Amino acid sequence: MSKKSKKIDMLNGSLWDKMIVFALPLAFTGMLQQLFNAADVMTLGRFVSNEAMAGVGNNVPIIGLIISFVMGLALGANVIVARCLGMRDDAKANRAVHTAFATAVIFGVFAVLLGEAIAGPAMDILDVPDVVRSDAEIYLRVFLLGFPFIAIYNFLAAVMRSQGDTQTPLWALVAASLFNIAGNLFAVMVLGWGTGGVALATVLANAVAAGLLFVKLLKTEGALHLDLKQLFKIDREALKPIVRIGWPAGLQGAVFSVSNLIIQAAINSLGPAVMAGSVAAFTVEINVYCFINAFGLAATTFVSQNYGAGNLPRCRRATWVSMGLNFVATFMMIALVVGFGRELLSLFSDSAEVIELAMTRIYWVVLFEPISVIMETVSDAMRGYGYSMPPAMVTLICVCSVRIIWVWTVFAAYHDYIVLMIVYPVSWAVTAVALCWLYYRHQKILEKKPRFAKQTAEA
């Protein structure tokens, strides 16, 4: 790996050390992305009110739905650019880079228009209590104005990730996070703008992150170079696989968010304290998922490059090495979050009741995250092969059906917070089993392809 270019040779040599170098900055990037929400929640919880904090928390599933979808689309760009690099076709990779940027801008603007139109009805669907509705709707409407910047950042980060550069997006987000924290405090403590001011600071911070990556790629030479004259030039040959792979991946992420909307509505029926506790716990627990997601994306990128190079055995090794490293990282994060949970939660609220309710969620969600390791790794590995729609459909059917049935039957019968939280590990387990079966079937299909028949026979 070259320090200057920050590229990683995914086609040769050992895998585990390169995956760690690839995944750790990506995990920290994910944590910093969550820090945007955490900074907003902490600022409002500490300097405004628990109601303001709960109002922002009600938007987490909605914002998560849109962001999950754009990250899924960006994954399509990651896979295609990585495959082109594996094939040593820099010209094709560059066309995909410009297509990815144009797609990000178009989707970002569309998301703003759609989001602003449904912001009010979304509050009704979630049955947001009147006491927090004003804060929730103000935050969502202002936040959505910055969505084009979120889309641009995620697509450009995916492009950089395709050649192993996960450090530049991290440092861009570090700068943006510092800006966000300072902006939040200035908006609330100096200007007294409350929820709207906090949301505006987040919009500007997202613009900083996107702008830094944009400038970086303008100055980059080679396959990933952005040319101002071709920014909105869409190559149909590149767009089709980006959408074909990215659309199902985005759908899968959105499915989780839709199911979380259903769970959020159930949480809202349990009162403001439970709402605040759930928000605080989610803000802490999501950091565990950042590591799971990072090593899953490592599987996607390493598999994609090696699949482009025609090396199926190395694709398989990349999948299992990624899963092993993922387990190690996840268990370490679980120990940290569970061991220091109360101390971390005290940053969001000084209410003993809220903290205990938050710990309840952490016990029932975080301790079962290893199931997610299996689910995410096999799903992300299949996307690296360009096999994206089937994993998305399996997730759609398993996650949504289990969670909807659980909320409408088991939770409806007992109406208890713990009963509601149990739906997370149950839905993960069902989905993980189904995805493992799908992965096995897909590998058998690959073995029959002429380009891989000799490799699998020798293995």
Which residue ranges define each predicted feature?
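Short runs within selected transmembrane alpha-helices of multi-pass transporters and secretion channels
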Residues: 74, 143-161, 169-180, 198-213, ...
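Short alpha-helical transmembrane segments in multi-pass integral membrane proteins
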Residues: 1-23, 81-146, 188-247, 303-368, ...
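Transmembrane helical elements of multi-pass membrane transporters/channels
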Residues: 21-40, 142, 176, 205-209, ...
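N-terminal transmembrane alpha-helices
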Residues: 10-48, 61-76, 80, 105-112, ...
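Small-residue-rich hydrophobic transmembrane alpha-helices
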Residues: 53-113, 150-169, 277-341, 372-395
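Hydrophobic alpha-helical transmembrane segments in multi-pass membrane proteins
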Residues: 22, 26-34, 71, 103-112, ...
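Alpha-helical transmembrane segments of multipass membrane proteins
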Residues: 38-42, 113, 121, 155-159, ...
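Helix-terminus/linker motif at the lipid-water interface of multi-pass membrane proteins
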Residues: 31, 35-54, 123-130, 186-193, ...
